[in-house]
């Protein structure tokens, strides 16, 4: 709307006016004298943009409009990124809960075996009680994870503009696919994609245009006004009495107590501030992108290492359980192996989650993703 208003200011303003007037006069006599006047006219006013004042104002309005467009795009991109990250975190919690429930079953089996061996005199009561402690400790993790899952579902519903409800999902974290490489072009293409940089650029353009407006306000302004119409004392004779009026007005500042110069100085200061803000936005964009790329590459290394750790911990736990059944080691060694495998599983799940989140962060850093 503001863009259209500023554009219209460059064009002549045309208005129409129709009037009818009736007067009754009595100058001391008994009868009233009636007089009627009918008039139809077009009024035209036009400010000539001699110094570019109106053009600068139009440029500022267009830039401010584009600011709002980029702000909307930035908000949409942020919401998409936040929803994606929250969803990956939710599925990671699902995976962790699944791991805990599997571990809980293993702990229950461990308690059963420890009780049988204790009652058979093969082990002490300590091993049996320790197995019960581990079972109880693992069981406490279930309601806490269920609480976190419900809260995360509420977060996603809020971001989606919905009332809290269950979020539909059908995948475990390990089933998501993520890119092996990042086909990113030259960093300068960031300037073409990131809405925050585009918004900062439009703010800079608007600030520069406002400097132009303040500067041209110190020069005279020429306005033309005209009227074209017809006037008559009889409605039937209205079109037979045309007239036309044209005048010009030159308005120039003479003594304004330094108001215009102060305004110009203020707009220049605002421009300098927007220039620094633009430079900061560009530097922030490159920093965030670089951080996202580093995180993506390093998290892949972390994932590979944790996957290897998970496999090794699984082999160690299987061996420890076999040796315990054969009486080679005590139950504390089995518990230690089980704890190690549990931690390795959670660590691997977190690595997958972190890798997916880095893709989301990279999507946001690149202003909405990249082309394959």
Regions found by a protein language model. Give the residues of each.
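Transmembrane beta-barrel strands of outer-membrane/channel proteins
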Residues: 16-22, 224-230
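Acidic, low-complexity, intrinsically disordered peripheral segments
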Residues: 164, 178, 326, 347-372
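Periplasmic alpha-helical coiled-coil/stalk elements that build and connect Gram-negative outer-membrane
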Residues: 54, 63, 70-186, 295, ...
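Bacterial Sec-pathway N-terminal export signals of envelope proteins
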Residues: 1-2, 175-205, 253-254, 279-282, ...
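A glycine-/polar-enriched beta->alpha junction
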Residues: 1-12, 25, 41-60, 70-77, ...
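Short terminal targeting/anchoring segments
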Residues: 126, 330-350
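Residues that define the transmembrane beta-barrel architecture of outer-membrane proteins
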Residues: 34-38, 242-244
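Metallo-beta-lactamase
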Residues: 145, 195-196, 274, 351
């Amino acid at each position: 709307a503001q863009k259209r208003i500023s554009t219209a200011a460059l064009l002549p303003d045309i208005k129409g006016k129709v009037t009818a007037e009736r007067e009754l006069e009595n100058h001391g006599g008994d009868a009233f004298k009636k007089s009627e006047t009918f008039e139809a006219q077009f009024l035209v006013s036009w400010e000539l943009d001699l110094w570019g004042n109106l053009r600068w104002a139009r440029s500022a309005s267009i830039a401010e409009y584009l600011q709002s467009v980029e702000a909307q795009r930035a908000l949409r991109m942020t919401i998409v990124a936040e929803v994606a990250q929250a969803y990956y975190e939710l599925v990671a919690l699902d995976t962790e809960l699944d791991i805990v429930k599997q571990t809980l079953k293993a702990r229950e089996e461990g308690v059963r075996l420890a009780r049988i061996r204790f009652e058979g005199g093969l082990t002490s009561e300590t091993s049996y009680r320790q197995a019960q402690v581990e079972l109880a400790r693992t069981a406490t993790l279930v309601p806490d994870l269920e609480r976190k899952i419900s809260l995360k579902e509420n977060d996603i519903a809020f971001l989606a503009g919905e009332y809290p409800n269950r979020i539909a999902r059908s995948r475990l974290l390990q089933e998501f696919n993520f890119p092996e490489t990042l086909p990113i072009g030259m960093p300068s293409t960031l300037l073409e994609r990131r809405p925050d940089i585009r918004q900062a650029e439009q703010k800079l353009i608007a600030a520069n245009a406002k400097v132009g407006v303040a500067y041209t306000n110190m020069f005279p302004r020429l306005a033309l006004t005209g009227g074209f119409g017809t006037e008559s004392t009889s409605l039937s004779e209205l079109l037979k009495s045309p007239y036309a009026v044209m005048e010009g007005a030159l308005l120039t500042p003479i003594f304004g107590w330094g108001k215009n110069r102060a305004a110009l100085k203020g707009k220049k200061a605002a421009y300098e501030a927007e220039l620094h803000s633009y430079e900061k936005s560009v530097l922030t964009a490159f920093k965030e992108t670089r951080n996202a790329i580093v995180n993506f590459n390093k998290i892949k290394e972390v994932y590979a290492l944790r996957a290897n750790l998970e496999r090794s911990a699984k082999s160690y736990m299987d061996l420890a359980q076999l040796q315990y059944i054969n009486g080679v080691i005590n139950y504390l060694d089995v518990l230690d192996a089980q704890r190690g495998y549990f931690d390795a599983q959670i660590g691997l799940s977190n690595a997958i989650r972190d890798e997916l989140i880095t893709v989301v962060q990279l999507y946001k850093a690149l202003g909405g993703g990249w082309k394959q």
